[in-house]
Amino acid sequence: MISFNYETNFKLENEDCLEKWIQKIILNHNREEGEINYIFCDDAYLLKLNIEFLQHDTLTDIISFDNSLGRLVGGDIFISTERVADNANDFKVSFLEELQRVMIHGVLHYIGFSDKTPESQKEMTIQENNALKELTNLMSIN
């Protein structure tokens, strides 16, 4: 089950389509969907979590808590929409594209992809780009 929760005024459009997309990416990697909770929040909310749970006193766009068991993919993914907006501006992409990239980034971590080394970062980017193409295809069908 995939749920979308909001700790800010932000609200996703096309929740159903995004849920199907995330499910498809999970299945494409030979995994099963568990309970995935997206929590959209602001910088202050995510900074508090970053300090409390990771002992990092820095802003970030995403924090994910992985509860995956074997092939069952699940966890809580906290996303700062403020940080996503700033990053979109820095990377010269739309807010929506950056948000979708960050959303799937958390799931890819649950599937087993890392971004700790330059090589694994390249692979993560490839996986994100492939997932974004899947979303484009899915949205053109609907």
Residue ranges and their predicted role:
Residues 104, 108-112:
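Short active-site segment of divalent metal-dependent hydrolases/proteases
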